[in-house]
Amino acid sequence: MAREDLIEVEAKVKEILPNTKFIVELDNGHTVVAHVSGKIRIHNIRILPGDKVTVELSPYDLSRGRITYRKK
């Protein structure tokens, strides 16, 4: 069930942090700490530096996000 107020943006993975967190750079140049969504975790999709991903941001805290899709 998707939430209506989320902001979806494209980003590029810059760095991998512990506990499946990533530093991603948005298309507009901002940097965000993002974690992996449950579906990506269940299906063991590997995310590496340089990958293009889709990130969901909450309008309340724009410094954190959730990676929901990895581009091929």
Curated annotation (Swiss-Prot):
S1-like domain sequence ranges: 1-72
Cited InterPro entries: NA-bd_OB-fold (IPR012340), RNA-binding_domain_S1_IF1 (IPR006196), S1_domain (IPR003029), TIF_IF1 (IPR004368)
Subcellular location: Cytoplasm
Key word Protein biosynthesis present: yes
Signal sequence annotation: none
GO molecular function, one term: rRNA binding
Function: One of the essential components for the initiation of protein synthesis. Stabilizes the binding of IF-2 and IF-3 on the 30S subunit to which N-formylmethionyl-tRNA(fMet) subsequently binds. Helps modulate mRNA selection, yielding the 30S pre-initiation complex (PIC). Upon addition of the 50S ribosomal subunit IF-1, IF-2 and IF-3 are released leaving the mature 70S translation initiation complex.
Entry-linked PANTHER family: TRANSLATION INITIATION FACTOR IF-1, CHLOROPLASTIC
Family, as annotated: Belongs to the IF-1 family.
Subunit field text: Component of the 30S ribosomal translation pre-initiation complex which assembles on the 30S ribosome in the order IF-2 and IF-3, IF-1 and N-formylmethionyl-tRNA(fMet); mRNA recruitment can occur at any time during PIC assembly.
Protein name: Translation initiation factor IF-1
Organism: Acholeplasma laidlawii (strain PG-8A)
